[in-house]
């Protein structure tokens, strides 16, 4: 089981601080004892507490696209991610992790 925290900033409001994300993650640490991370920008804040199942060492979240324009947190399991990944690799996608979450990001 994992935990996700998030906040979307209304137009004209101040950007959220990463410290707020860390405090939000602290509340849900019991949901994901293995790893945690925070993304904060001027529009949103995403927090993730992870129970590592797939790519235990390399599946840190939030996960970013190669150009850092897209960020994802994901709680779930893609059972056919290896098949999907193989198809994406055939189409030229390059993966940085072994995580099923990155398959979503690359698709």
Language model features with spans:
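N-terminus-centric sequence/structural signature that marks the extreme N-terminus
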Residues: 1-107
């Amino acid at each position: 089981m994992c935990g996700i925290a998030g906040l979307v900033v209304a137009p004209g409001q101040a950007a959220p601080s990463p410290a707020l994300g860390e405090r939000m993650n602290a509340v849900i640490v019991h949901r994901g004892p293995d790893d945690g991370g925070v993304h904060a920008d001027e529009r949103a804040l995403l927090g993730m507490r992870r129970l590592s199942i797939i790519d235990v060492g390399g599946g840190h979240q939030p996960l970013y696209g190669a150009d850092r324009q897209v960020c994802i947190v994901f709680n779930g399991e893609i059972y056919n991610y290896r098949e999907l990944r193989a198809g994406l690799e055939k189409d030229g996608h390059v993966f940085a992790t072994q995580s099923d979450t990155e398959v979503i990001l690359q698709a």
